[in-house]
Every structure is written in structure tokens, then in C-alpha cells.
Amino acid sequence: SFSGDTKDNNKRVIALTSLTADLVDRLNSKSLLGIPGTSLLKSKEQFKDKVIVSQGRNPPSIEKIISLQPDLVLGAKGFHTKALSQLNDLGIETISTEIKNLNDLELLINRISKNLGVDNQSLLSLVPNCEKTTGEFPSRSTIVLVSSAPLLSPNKNSWAGSLLNEFNINNLISDIQSKSGFDGYVTLSPEVLLEKNPDNIVLIDTGNDMQNLFLSK
């Protein structure tokens, strides 16, 4: 993890999302005190000593957060809005995040860096795999599925869809408007999937045996 030249080594940070926990860990791991109880973080060695302040889709424990005496709490706009507001009322600084594209992520990295007092790092230096490949990317048509019931696929207005566009992947759902109730995601019927007939179908593993659920349809 990058620790950088810190102006304030005593900054105490709690991250309520996997993304913000990962970013703080990469920028200055010593600042990160609390994390969400996601399997993504629990499986990584660098987070084993961090305090878990939330589980699953349940709201974070305000009492546990306060007991850690944080200087800063990072959460997701919408899902954590109520908790962040309560913490603000108690005089704790908060940052509400909404990441829809790579530019939003760059801005968040810059904001966290300034708050921690560390040298700002580019997205590419933190995540080298974000570098675009040189040469012409094959234009095979693709549909990404993030859920099997219902079949949900990201358009260009979602974080996943913006990444597909950024790396010139031919997302057949990119310009279809969302009517699913999930902003940035389109509900597909099996008939539409067959009609689109993509060269590639990418299944996002959410831990629910996505492949078998999809094939059962």
C-alpha cells in the first residue's frame, strides 16, 4: 500500500464501502480503522485487523463508528445518506460518494488524498490495469449481466457501462434506456437477449451461482 509523505499521520478514517476502503488502504493504510463486512474485504490480508462497522445490506452501526473516534467517514450517496447525516450532526466530517464513471473516481481519489494529507496519486498508478490497451480493440458485441433474476445489464449511465465504453467494448445495451428501477441498468427478457445475439455474454459473479441460474433460464 502507498503511504506517501503524510502531513497528518493521525487521520482516523472509516470507509463504509469496499471501494473507499480499498482507496484509503492504497493511499495511507494506517489511516483506515473501520470497514464494511464484505467478503471482498474479509478475504484480503491487509484488512484483517480493521474493525467491521456494517454487515450486508444493513445500515452501519453508528455506535461502533463513534467509538472509533473517526476524523472522516466515507459512504455511498443514497444508501449511507442517513448515517452520514447523523455523523455530521455529531461533528464528524463525512464524504458522500457517487461513482458513475472514471472521472468521478479520479475526483474521489484527489479528494481523499487532500483530506489525508498525502501526495495525490493518479488512477493509473493505483490501478495499473486501468491503462488502455494500444491498437484496435476487437469489436465483438457484448452483453454484461449483473443479475439473473431479473436479467439486469448495464447501459452507459452506470459505473459498469462507463467502464465498458472507456475500454471500447461494444456493449449492445449501452444506449438502451433504463426502465428497471435500477438507475443505469436495463431489465432484459430472454427473448431480447436472443434477439441481440451477442458474440460474448459476461456474467458477473455475485456469489449466487450466477452461471447455473442463468443457464436454467
Spans of features found by a protein language model:
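Proline-aspartate-enriched helix->loop->beta-strand connector
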Residues: 61-75, 92, 187-206
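Short secondary-structure boundary segments
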Residues: 17, 77, 146-149, 200, ...
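Charged, glycine-enriched surface loops/patches
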Residues: 83-120, 206-217
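Bacterial Sec-exported substrate-binding components of ABC uptake systems
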Residues: 1-23, 60-63, 85, 115-145, ...
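Extracytoplasmic ligand-binding site segments that recognize negatively charged/polar headgroups
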Residues: 82, 98-113, 143-163
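A short, structured surface patch at a secondary-structure boundary
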Residues: 11-68, 72-77, 169-172
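His/Asp/Glu-enriched short active-site or ligand-binding loop at hydrolase and phosphoryl-transfer sites
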Residues: 36, 160-184
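Short helix-initiation/N-cap motifs at beta->coil->alpha
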Residues: 53-63, 177-191
